[in-house]
A protein has these predicted regions:
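Structured alpha/beta or helical-core interaction and ligand-binding surfaces enriched in interleaved
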Residues: 1-171, 175, 182, 186, ...
Length: 192
């Protein structure tokens, strides 16, 4: 089952609380997360520096969640364990899935890390592409799907994705492509 999040159905005044509820679901279900290194001119490195001691691995890949890039321009992904310290850092430092403030305007905060993804046993649980406003969840059962729906309004079945946003299909970069890249990492880091 796949769920797609459409934030048009999420009232702006609830965004901060909804993000924390979404974190609760992901923190209870995942064991690792990743962030992409942004290439923006002006960046806030606070999040990146806070997470630096917890890096499991840096990865350069041409395929990731909703990304398919040329070999000459790979994505730079950082993989982290999900533990009490990294949970606390994410809660305090990561301000929004789509890097906007509560009014829907781009904030002065432009982090050096974006595109938050959560994993469980090496499988994608939730993936985002911040600047494209893409967020999809892959709950393993109906109970977890309901927890996502209860945490934040705006989830729909994957058929909404197929009709309205074709990024992944058009680029032939399926959400599971990142699992291929992670197999090596998770097998090498059994502590994840």
């Amino acid at each position: 089952m796949a769920l797609v999040f459409d934030d048009r159905y999420q009232p702006r005044e609830e965004s901060a609380e909804a993000l924390q509820r979404l974190f609760d679901v992901c923190f209870d279900s995942a064991d690792a997360f990743s962030l992409s290194r942004a290439a923006w001119a002006r960046q806030d490195h606070t999040l990146e520096r806070a997470l630096e001691p917890y890096v499991l691995r840096w990865l350069q890949t041409t395929r990731w969640f909703c990304y398919y890039t040329a070999n000459s321009n790979p994505q730079r992904i950082v993989l982290y364990p999900l533990n009490e310290q990294t949970k606390s850092i994410l809660r305090a430092q990561y301000r929004g899935l789509f890097l906007e403030d509560w009014s829907g305007r781009l904030p002065r905060w432009v982090p050096s890390m974006e595109d938050l993804c959560f994993f469980r046993n090496g499988t994608l649980l939730l993936g985002t592409v911040s600047h494209e406003r893409i967020c999809m969840a892959y709950p393993e059962d109906g109970e977890l799907a309901q927890r996502f729906r209860d945490a934040i309004r705006g989830w729909g079945e994957a058929d909404i994705w197929n009709r309205s946003i074709s990024c992944c299909r058009r680029l032939r970069a399926t959400p599971r492509n990142c699992v291929f890249a992670l197999r090596r990492i998770f097998s090498a880091n059994s502590a994840v």
